[in-house]
């Protein structure tokens, strides 16, 4: 690995005889930072910074490359090349909106956060904040999906979020989770973990079947199976998970993410341990010269009752416990005594000087969310959500033509699923729109028939 990294450092750089270019698909920057953190050899960190600093400056490297006599076009997207596709349209510190290929973008933003942290680069860090806010406030689906265009798998414009032809690649959501996790660990602000959780419990987990044998590459919010036709604008949309793909980045990326969940659950800063996610686990966490053992018992996200046992405490530590934005009546107990909440950036702070047993309780009411009216695709539509889970109305429970279903009240019944372990299903009352005949257009208004709509959970 070091030999390959050294080859990259020799080949690319600002010196005479070196290639003054940068990656077409950003990711090596992340690897170089990680190699620096393992080896402490600063040349790898400097190389990552070089790739970021030169990107989008001067003559565009990819456009100049096309002028070379021996240039060969390999990828069709480079035929009519738009520099924003690879985020090389501006210097990275000047970029304020998420542009181009979604996976490339968030992997680059993750590297920007890493480099900003290592160099204490406030300008680069502010660019990360600007880009993260643009995505989460104007260019991200409620499931955490990013990349609203199937063509070039890219971001488009603010509030352009179609539901039935978007891309929302699984890898893009993994990249967004990586970016958000880095921002959380740098700032200790729980708003970034809200997005990590949104990605993990929705767009990422939806990308893999319960048996782990089939996958979604793209994750639209609305699928009409008969419209998933080849050679159309929905050719990329699949109504069923696929066994494998020609470009098979998503399946192993999901596996890698699930295998590395520990990095998402906890963060450490000095003598402070941050509990980001309430996923049942048992782990050893180094704190200074000590090792703290934490055991968490949890039925989250179906129940808001979490028990945490902390052992091996030999010096004062602070345990930061995230208060989810959707949680109501958050209560904290330590060794049987209810604690007065001391909050900071969305975390409840608990100071421990000895081994302790902690209990966390909160309620997760069903929420009905509405998109900003600038999202034209969502006018007249509602999202049903409980905790981090966005629920999905499916044909197997409610018949076809789901777009005809109308919810006329917010009374929700919760029940245990008979198909998916401890998952909760939601049941609501609603109506179905019925056209007067099979004609395409009519001057007669549609009528309603009563419908009992069963909400089913995503495949988690």
Where do the protein language model's features map onto the residues?
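Beta-strand-rich binding/interaction modules
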Residues: 316-334
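Single conserved hydrophobic/aromatic residue that forms the stacking wall/gate
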Residues: 450-460
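Long, well-ordered core segments of solenoidal/helical folds
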Residues: 1-16, 48-63, 77-81, 128-143, ...
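Aromatic-lined, polymer-binding surfaces characteristic
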Residues: 1-37
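C-terminal beta-rich recognition modules with glycine/proline-rich loops and embedded aromatic residues
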Residues: 48, 128, 194-202, 207-309, ...
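Structural helix-adjacent loops and short alpha-helical linkers that scaffold large soluble proteins
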Residues: 1-2, 36-49, 56, 116-129, ...
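Carbohydrate-binding/catalytic loop surfaces
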Residues: 23-36, 65-101, 145-169, 212-242
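Well-ordered alpha-helical scaffold segments within catalytic/enzyme domains
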Residues: 29-40, 107-122, 160-164, 175-188, ...
């Amino acid at each position: 690995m070091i030999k390959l990294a050294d080859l990259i450092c020799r080949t690319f750089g600002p010196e005479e005889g070196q290639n003054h270019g940068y990656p077409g698909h950003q990711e090596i920057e992340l690897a170089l930072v990680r190699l620096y953190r393992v080896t402490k050899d600063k040349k790898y960190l400097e190389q990552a910074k070089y790739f970021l600093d030169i990107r989008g400056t001067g003559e565009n490297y990819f456009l100049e490359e096309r002028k070379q006599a021996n240039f060969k076009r390999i990828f069709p997207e480079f035929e009519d090349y738009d520099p924003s596709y690879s985020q090389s349209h501006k210097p990275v510190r000047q970029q304020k909106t998420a542009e181009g290929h979604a996976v490339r973008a968030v992997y680059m933003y993750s590297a920007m956060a890493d480099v900003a942290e290592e160099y204490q680069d406030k300008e680069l860090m502010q660019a990360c904040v600007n880009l993260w806010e643009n995505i989460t406030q104007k260019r991200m689906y409620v499931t955490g999906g990013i990349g609203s265009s199937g063509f070039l798998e890219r971001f488009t414009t603010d509030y352009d979020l179609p539901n039935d032809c978007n891309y929302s690649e699984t890898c893009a959501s993994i990249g967004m989770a990586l970016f958000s996790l880095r921002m959380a660990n740098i700032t200790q602000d729980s708003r970034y973990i809200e997005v990590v959780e949104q990605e993990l419990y929705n767009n990422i987990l939806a990308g893999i079947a319960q048996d782990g044998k089939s996958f979604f590459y793209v994750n639209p919010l609305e699928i009409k199976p008969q419209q998933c036709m080849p050679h159309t604008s929905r050719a990329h949309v699949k109504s069923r998970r696929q066994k494998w793909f020609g470009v098979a980045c998503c399946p192993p990326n999901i596996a890698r993410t699930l295998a590395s969940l520990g990095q998402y659950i906890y963060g450490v800063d000095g003598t402070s341990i941050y509990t980001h996610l309430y996923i049942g686990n048992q782990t050893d966490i180094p704190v200074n010269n000590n090792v703290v053992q934490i055991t968490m018992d949890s039925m989250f996200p179906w129940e808001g009752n979490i028990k945490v046992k902390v052992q091996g405490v030999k010096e004062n530590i602070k345990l930061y416990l995230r208060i989810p934005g959707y949680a109501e009546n958050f209560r904290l107990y330590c060794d049987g005594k209810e604690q007065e909440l001391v909050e900071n950036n969305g975390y409840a702070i608990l100071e421990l000087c000895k081994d302790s047993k902690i209990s966390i309780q909160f309620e997760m009411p069903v929420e009905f969310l509405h998109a900003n009216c600038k999202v034209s695709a969502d006018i007249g539509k509602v999202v049903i959500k409980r905790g981090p889970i966005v629920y999905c109305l499916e044909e197997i429970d409610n018949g076809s033509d789901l777009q005809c279903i109308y919810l006329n009240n917010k009374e929700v019944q919760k029940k245990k699923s008979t198909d998916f372990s401890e998952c909760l299903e939601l049941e609501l009352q609603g109506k179905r729109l019925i056209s007067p005949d099979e004609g395409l257009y009519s001057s007669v208004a549609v009528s309603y028939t009563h419908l009992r709509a069963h909400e089913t959970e995503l495949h988690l």
